[in-house]
Amino acid sequence: MSIRVYLWWNSLLYSSMNILLINDNTEHLNWGAQATVFALRKMFEEHIPAISLDAIPWNWLRREYRQVQLPGKLKFTYQRWRHNVIAEKFLNRISSSAEFFPAIFDDFDYYADQWMACNADPEAADFLRRATAADAVVYNGENSIYRNTVEGCRALFLLWVAKTRLHKPSAIINHTAHLDNVQPRMPAMVRHLFPILDVVTCREPSGWRQIKGMGIDHAELVPDAVFYLRDTIDGNEAFQTWKQAAGLEGKPYFCLSGSALPASEPRSVWDGKVVELVRRLQKFGLHPVLVAKDPDCLFLEEVARRTGGSFFGPEHSFHEMWPLFRGASFLVSGHYHYVIAAASAGCPFIPLSVNNWKMQGVCIHLEWQRTEPFDVTDLGSCMPELVAEARRLLKDREALSKALMARTERLCEESVLNAVRVREMATQGTTVTTYERR
């Protein structure tokens, strides 16, 4: 049965299902984050009959507000304005920060009561309206449950409101939980919120084990949603145009990207270790393609200049990652979703360290021979081993490519559980309607 027939048949059996998705990363400055929400939308549409999807964007979760005290007890609240330095300095002198979200778990109930009483964020009423109209509230946990991120803490609070005040079926899916080695504010939020959620899916093994170790027994290990896209993304036309302009037709190349951690970038007469690494890899007779979307990785454009390489920059769409990596001999990267796209396209990879255990997790998922990433902050020490790893990948590329594509096909099938669990939750209703107020 084709997917279209399947959806038509199920639409006859199910009424419309309204899902409120928190954390739409479409406008995020990261290709992987953009690909995540694209994949989730595609997955939901294909596996949840008659779905109606409402979404709260990532930047909504990061908005800052300030208040000006007016005569009497009146206050004027406005969204922080950053477009003019002089104007912002003046406004900051006559205003104070307006806090509408809790910073720690102990304050969740106080702020939830304020929200329900309409004494909160100017957008609180809008969120409550949209959450009330939804059959279920789902938080896309991409890029947030670590480092006490503002958007992560706020999204957890929104789930708390949806679950404990509005009694909505609620879920967090597709997330990495890395609650160690940070100022510990998130662990308490997770410890109290996750047990009362209807669905919790973790996308990599280490985060899943940590969540399970906190007593959250119903948490499930489900591969990242981007695996669902496989190598089916249509970015070929735009990529081919760039490839011809870059003079890469018929030229063997490798790709290298950065990481969320800082790397040794070129400065003045200092080339830095990234340039040195690229030059070492060029000795295999390959043309370097430096890949960067995130602002912190744009130094790779200078690396491309110094090495005679090509720069694949932020003007490109995430859709073009698949054809880019499909033609590469290998990828060196500390970006989680770049590795997923590369593996799906049959491109072997060399993992670089990041600021959490995502990279180790994707290596385990892919049953990759090397699960310990190379330290991107100490390339000078690990460069000989990294170059040897590149030599191994080149030697065994064909076999490695076939193994990666077979494995990602399996992970694609398993990733659908993100949508299946949301569908079951919204259909069956919430399993927890009360909680012990502290």
Language-model segments: which ranges?
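Active-site anion-handling motifs in enzyme catalytic cores
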Residues: 8-438
